[in-house]
């Protein structure tokens, strides 16, 4: 098990909406890669219990998406609190990356970070202050080399583990076709 400060922590949350002042986390997943984006380990994929009242207040997009992908049923069946999910995730990460070493990695990761700061502050503090946001490269490619955007298509299941896997593949795609490091 390679515990290494160069390893990268990838995270994705699914939430009941976009406003951390009103909405909550309903799923969390993590993956650890090496610096070359090779997956070393997948962390626990955790549905976080939330009240029916909160779930019923989700907007139409969230209701439809999280019903179709089965997440609402998993959330209702879950007994996990946000704190329990946070602790399980931290237990996993501590085996792979020292505290403060990895930037938080993912797509539109600042949104996830806002929820972590509010509801999982110990996990938020585990990351380096920097972000590795794949959506930054997507935005730059759209402006500087839009033709390469056609080469990568997402499944968009809006399940946390699937979203992380896609983010890693997307960054590898941009590394090969946009950044050309060779």
From Swiss-Prot:
Q: Which GO terms describe its molecular function?
A: 3'-5'-RNA exonuclease activity; nucleic acid binding
Active-site residues (renumbered): 129
Give UniProt keywords alphabetically: Cytoplasm, Exonuclease, Hydrolase, Nuclease
Q: What is its main location?
A: cytoplasm
EC no.? 3.1.15.-
Q: What is this protein called?
A: Oligoribonuclease
Would you say which domain of life the source belongs to?
Bacteria
One Gene Ontology cellular component = cytoplasm
Q: Where are the transmembrane segments?
A: none
Would you kindly state one Gene Ontology biological process term found in this protein's UniProt entry? DNA metabolic process
Annotated source species = Haemophilus influenzae (strain PittEE)
Q: Which SUPFAM superfamilies match?
A: Ribonuclease H-like
């Amino acid at each position: 098990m390679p515990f290494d400060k160069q390893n990268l922590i990838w995270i994705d949350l699914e939430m009941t909406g976009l406003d951390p002042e009103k909405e909550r986390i309903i799923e969390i997943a993590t993956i650890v890669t090496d610096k070359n984006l090779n997956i070393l380990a997948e962390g626990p994929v955790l549905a976080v219990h939330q009240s029916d009242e909160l779930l019923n207040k989700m907007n139409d997009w969230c209701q439809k998406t999280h019903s179709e992908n089965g997440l609402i049923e998993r959330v209702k069946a879950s007994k996990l609190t946000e704190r329990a999910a946070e602790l399980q995730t931290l237990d996993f990460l501590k085996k792979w990356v020292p505290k403060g070493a990895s930037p938080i990695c993912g797509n539109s990761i600042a949104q996830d970070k806002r929820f972590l700061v509010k509801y999982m502050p110990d996990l938020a503090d585990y990351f380096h202050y920097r972000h590795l946001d794949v959506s930054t490269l997507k935005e730059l490619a759209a402006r500087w080399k839009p033709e390469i955007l056609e080469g990568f298509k997402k499944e968009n299941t809006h399940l946390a583990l699937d979203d992380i896997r896609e983010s890693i593949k997307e960054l590898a795609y941009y590394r090969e076709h946009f950044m050309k490091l060779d």
